Amino acid sequence: MKTEEPLSATVEEYLEMIYNMNMEDEVVIGARLAEKFLVAPPTVTEMLKRLVRDGYVEMDNRRQVTLTETGNQAAEAVLRRHRLTERFLVDMLGMQWHQVHEEACRLEHFISGAVEARVITTLNNPTTCPHGNPIPGSVANARSYLKDKGAIRLSSVGIGEVVSILCISEVVEDEEALILYLHEKGLTPGTQLTVLGEDGGSGGGNEQDESFKVQVDGREVCISKASSAKIWVTR
């Protein structure tokens, strides 16, 4: 019997990124993917041609990219391994919340089905990764998780509103400076905060834009508008 060839790490990373951008209602086009992966546009163009050829993605007349059912299943399989690995690194190995994304990116491509099953059993079938994102297969309809939870971006919350952090965008988990800043300031899933108002400076990440202050556990924290758009909250 012919064994299906495993996907390359690069293909899996593209499928993950497209899935996450689709989930967060971001427009997925070649130029945006080039920005995310820090590669030249022609590199992305060639990869998208391959993904279309192999039946993983479709492109409309505006060159917007969406996953096919095959692509969606493949993306969820690798995201499941990624988020389970993050959970294992935090819960079992004691690594810090902000340290595990890169490690999981390296390990996710090599985890067998047997190891995945053992991790699930050991961790009692967790439903989210340490950053609050859903684990496909452990959460029904993971792709619509944000909509089902009624989540909104922190940047859209009005002054004086009290909200709870649901998750941090998977799309920006590789922005180490931002993830470390959120960790240090206690802006993690489950944290309740109050939006206080505009602030003249910039906080979190390297964005030089306007920012606003939030109150967390009685402390005032400054976060940039760009960074706050990467935090999903619920009222």
Regions found by a protein language model. Name each.
Residues 30, 48, 86:
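Helix-turn-helix DNA-binding elements, focusing on the entry/boundary residues of the two helices
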Residues 109-226:
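Mid-protein regulatory/catalytic core that forms ligand/cofactor-binding pockets
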Residues 52-62:
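A short, conserved structural fragment
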Residues 1-38:
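Extreme N-terminal segment that seeds HTH/winged-HTH DNA-binding domains in transcriptional regulators
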Residues 14, 33, 44-54, 182, ...:
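Basic amphipathic alpha-helical segments that dock to polyanions
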Residues 42, 98:
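Key DNA-contact positions within bacterial/archaeal DNA-binding proteins
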Residues 63-82:
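Basic, amphipathic "hinge/linker" alpha-helix immediately C-terminal to the N-terminal HTH DNA-binding motif
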